[in-house]
Regions:
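Alpha/beta-hydrolase active-site loop signature
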Residues: 14-18, 80, 200-203
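Gly/Ala-rich beta-loop-alpha elbow adjacent to hydrolase catalytic centers
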Residues: 51-55, 59
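Short amphipathic alpha-helix adjacent to the substrate-entry channel of hydrolases
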Residues: 1-9
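Active-site loop/oxyanion-hole signature of alpha/beta-hydrolase fold enzymes
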Residues: 8-50, 213
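Flexible "cap/lid" loop of the alpha/beta hydrolase fold
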Residues: 64, 73-102
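Catalytic histidine-centered segment of alpha/beta-hydrolase-like enzymes
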Residues: 199-212
Length: 225
């Protein structure tokens, strides 16, 4: 932390997901506008942004708009898919939609979520409980009304001159960057640095040390440290 204390490093995540009051609409353009205002107000040429999954897509969209305020963008598993499933069918959302109205307390959510992920509770009950609590707090509209369209990542990549690092997971374990998408991104911007991880979609959780080595490489490469 001391080494990078002179930098401004921001983890980009989705407003409304436990981090703000409920929103009228959940979409990347809405999220982007909220965070753009922050960077326009607090100008600093040494900003770095990092995002995971939808947060990575948001960070990449944001980079195109506020590039002059950034040194680099680090993307963990952006969903660079040509087609994206309906949000109501994605991940645990069918279970949440069916059961959330029954959760009167956080304990209800934890006990019910055990039915969906018994292995997760056996392996790491603390982490699994936190996941259940996140779903308990989240606005139900995040699971039912999220307006999402595939990202035009090629155009964004082509437009950027800042450093771009991408952490890519194993497709067979739940990764969301197909080989074709990786190739298209590199065709658009040959300076993008990809690193492959033999993990599922949550690289930071599954391969923490290797993940942070890659983040350090990104920060060192993007600065004069």
């Amino acid at each position: 932390f001391k080494k990078y204390s002179n930098l401004k490093i921001y983890a980009i995540d989705l407003p409304g997901h436990n981090k703000s009051s409920k929103l009228d609409e959940y979409s990347l353009p809405i999220f982007k506008k909220i965070i753009e205002d922050f960077f326009e107000k607090y100008k600093n040429k040494r900003n770095y942004i990092i995002g995971h999954s939808l947060g990575a897509l948001l960070a990449f969209e944001l980079a195109q708009t506020v590039e002059n305020e950034l040194q680099g963008v680090f993307l963990e598993e952006p969903g660079w898919l040509d087609e994206f499933p309906d949000i109501k069918d994605f991940g645990p959302n069918p279970f949440i939609i069916q059961n959330k109205s029954k959760w009167k307390t956080p304990i209800d959510a934890i006990n019910n979520y055990k039915e969906l992920d018994p292995e997760g509770f056996d392996e790491n009950p603390y982490k699994a409980s936190l996941t259940a609590l996140r779903f308990y707090i989240n606005d139900i509209k995040i699971s039912t009304n999220f307006d999402f369209k595939p990202q035009n990542y090629q155009n964004i990549a082509k437009s950027l001159s800042i450093k771009i690092y991408v952490a890519r997971a194993n497709l067979e374990k739940g990764g969301m960057i197909p080989e074709q998408s990786k190739s298209k991104a590199l065709e658009s911007n040959k300076s993008i640095v990809f690193k492959e991880f033999d993990t599922g979609h949550n690289i930071m959780s599954e391969s923490t040390d290797e993940y942070f080595e890659f983040v350090s490489e990104f920060l060192n490469h993007s600065t004069d440290i």
